[in-house]
Amino acid sequence: MVSLNTNVAAMMTQRHLSQAADQNVESQRNLSSGYRINSASDDAAGLQISNTLHVQTRGIDVALRNAHDAYSVAQTAEGALHESSDILQRLRSLGLQAANGSHEQDDRKSLQQEVIALQDELDRVAITTTFADKNLFNGSYGSQSFHIGANANSISLALRNMRTHIPEMGGQHYLGDSLDKDWRVTRDNQQFAFEYQDNEGQAQSKVLTLKVGDNLEEVATYINAQQSVVDASVTQDHQLQFFTSTLNAPEGITWKGNFADEMDIGSGELVTVDDLDMSTVGGAQLAIGVVDAAIKYVDSHRSEIGGFQNRVSGTIDNLNTINRSVSESKGRIRDTDFARESTVMVRSQVLQDATTALLAQAKQRPSSALGLLS
């Protein structure tokens, strides 16, 4: 039916033109923003899920930065301990050199000058090693937590004091009376024993029977061969001395037996790397035990830090894997599929051009009614 008042064809064409235009605008918006979901009306459920995933990725990004910071702290600490270990190894070499009987007193004094310089350097490393203005080894660091999860997951790193004067950098020193250089073990002084508490608080004892006729050097060698609690050595003044770094009980060691009575071994005295004096044979021999204890302490802490580094490294790898998976999931939900959206936009443009041409024709349709009047 031809109608002058109602152009149905034009109205239908206009509606399709509007739909094509809306589709074209939506496609351009999706392509320009890079997102398939730009508002809740586009996909309410998808928007909620993608926002949840976005929050998770943001948390993982922060966790990764924290984990890298934690690894950097541990790496800095391990480097400082490596330097400390090298210094202690050099001190031990000097101790072995100074304990050699072929050296004169002046030689040992020269060695002691290097010892003093190394002591200062060891303290300098402990005092000046810092990360982000935090000192790592002067005893102030304590234990710090690093948040390495998307939520509130954390890992702690504890760094110890590495100054030369702390008890862990040495042990207890016991010194007996000076004896005659011709002293020998007799049946009257061959019994030797000592009692102590181990690190678990359990009472322990060692009982030794010395060989009659042995001199003081041979006694020290025999004592060292029979147990590992104390290191025995002889000073230049013919004094038997003992050093132990394995005991932390405040009571120390109780010496017993007629040999101990003759030695009149005094109470224990704390000796650390800060107290090293290699200008004498006895001091050099004592220094070897002290440095060995310090090396054990440093290496133990290096092992802890190495384990921490491995743990953080594994965490970083895991976080990267999770972050990649979550980002891919978020992208599939929210990001624009450019191939598909480009096709939709071209289709809507073609429809828009076609409906525009058809609308022009539809608008001419009422004029055909004039032909009926002529």
From Swiss-Prot:
Compartments, record wording: Secreted; Bacterial flagellum
Gene3D superfamilies: 3.30.70.2120, f41 fragment of flagellin, N-terminal domain, Flagellar export chaperone, C-terminal domain
Single GO term (MF): structural molecule activity
Keywords: Bacterial flagellum, Coiled coil, Secreted
Coiled coil (residue ranges): 102-126
GO cellular component term, pick one: extracellular region
Cited Pfam families: Flagellin_C (PF00700), Flagellin_IN (PF07196), Flagellin_N (PF00669)
NCBIfam families given in the database record: PRK08869.1-1, PRK08869.1-3
Record's miscellaneous remark: V.parahaemolyticus possesses two flagellar systems: a single polar flagellum propels the bacterium in liquid (swimming), while multiple lateral (peritrichous) flagella move the bacterium over surfaces (swarming). The polar flagellum is synthesized constitutively but lateral flagella are produced only under conditions in which the polar flagellum is not functional.
Description of how the protein assembles with itself and partners: Heteromer of multiple flagellin subunits including FlaA, FlaB/D, FlaC, FlaE and FlaF.
Protein name, entry field: Polar flagellin E
Organism: Vibrio parahaemolyticus serotype O3:K6 (strain RIMD 2210633)
Taxonomic placement: Bacteria, Pseudomonadati, Pseudomonadota, Gammaproteobacteria, Vibrionales
Gene name in the database record: flaE
